[in-house]
Every structure is written in structure tokens, then in C-alpha cells.
């Protein structure tokens, strides 16, 4: 039976490269000289540092620019709150989404069931597997998911015939 998986995975190598390029640009930019503006990545968390919130915004803009140049969708970024750290400095943690959250997986499953297309959607850990009798039905479901769910960058892989 034909099937495919719906996943939400960022290319972490490209994300890491974008963060390193952002750090390099922050180090050379004139408006960041003598400030504590910095960016670092650990696992799937990017941490922005700055002297004020506007500086965090500038660092985030640099990061978004570098991610876009490397063809990484910025919707993978899940911004946290701005936190004050020692003195006048602030930081912000941005998590890189990897995997579909359970609420979104249930929403996708419900969407597929309500479409009346003859396919089954099963939630498997951090992905949703869609199985059907015909390849055309699966392609219709892909189009439906792309059309209805736009706030999260979903991709389809493991297409089996």
C-alpha cells in the first residue's frame, strides 16, 4: 500500500552554519563594537545575547537573513521570552522545531479524516504516516495538508509505492 510521512524537520547543519555566519557578522559589524551582542547554538537551541531588546532584534534579523540565504524556513524558529541577565544585558532563547507536536499531529489526522479521501492517518512519535490504496489519493492529501496548515513548515518524505 502506498504511504508517506509528514514531518517537520529543519536541516540542523544549515542552521548551525547560519548561526556561525551570524556570529562572524556580529563580530565585524561597526554598530556592535564594544557591546555584548552575540549568538550561540547548543543542540536545538539558539541563544541571542545583547545589551538591549532592540539589539536582540538586530541579531535576530541577521540570523533570519542568514537562514533564508541557506534555504532554511524561518518558521522552524520558536522564539522564547526576553530575559534579563546580569547588569543591563538581556538574552533570548530560540528553539529550533524538530518533529510535529501532538496537537498539530491530531489536527492533521482530523483534517485527513474529515476530507473523506480514502486514506488513513496514523500518528507515529513525531511524524504522521498517511496510507492509502491509490497514489492519487495520497497526492490529494499532500495538497490538502499544504493548503490548510501554513504556520508550520511541513515536508513529506518516505514516499512508498
Swiss-Prot record:
Classification via InterPro entries: DUF520, UPF0234-like_C, UPF0234_N, YajQ-like_sf
S-S bonds: none
GO molecular function: nucleotide binding
Highest taxon listed in the record's lineage: Bacteria
Record flagged with keyword Thylakoid: no
Keywords: Nucleotide-binding
Keyword Nucleotide-binding appears in the UniProt entry: yes
GO cellular component terms given for this protein: cytosol
PANTHER family assigned to the protein according to its UniProt record, in alphabetical order: UPF0234 PROTEIN YAJQ
Family per record: Belongs to the YajQ family.
Protein purpose: Nucleotide-binding protein.
HAMAP family the UniProt entry points to: YajQ (MF_00632)
Protein name, UniProt field: Nucleotide-binding protein Aave_1854
Native source species: Paracidovorax citrulli (strain AAC00-1)
Amino acid at each position: 500500500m502506498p504511504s508517506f510521512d509528514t514531518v517537520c524537520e529543519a536541516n540542523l547543519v544549515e542552521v548551525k552554519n547560519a548561526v556561525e555566519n551570524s556570529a562572524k557578522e556580529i563580530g565585524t559589524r561597526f554598530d556592535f563594537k564594544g557591546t555584548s551582542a552575540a549568538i550561540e547554538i547548543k543542540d536545538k537551541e539558539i541563544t541571542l545575547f545583547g545589551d538591549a531588546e532592540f539589539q536582540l532584534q538586530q541579531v535576530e534579523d541577521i540570523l533570519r537573513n542568514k537562514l533564508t540565504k541557506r534555504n532554511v524556513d524561518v518558521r522552524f524558529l520558536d522564539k522564547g521570552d526576553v530575559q534579563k541577565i546580569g547588569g543591563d544585558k538581556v538574552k533570548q532563547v530560540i528553539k529550533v522545531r524538530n518533529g510535529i507536536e501532538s496537537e498539530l499531529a491530531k489536527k492533521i489526522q482530523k483534517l485527513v479524516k474529515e476530507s473523506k479521501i480514502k486514506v488513513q492517518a496514523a500518528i507515529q512519535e513525531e511524524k504522521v504516516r498517511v496510507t492509502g490504496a491509490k497514489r492519487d489519493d495520497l497526492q490529494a492529501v499532500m495538497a490538502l495538508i499544504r493548503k490548510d496548515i501554513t504556520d508550520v513548515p511541513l515536508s513529506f518524505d518516505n514516499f512508498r509505492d
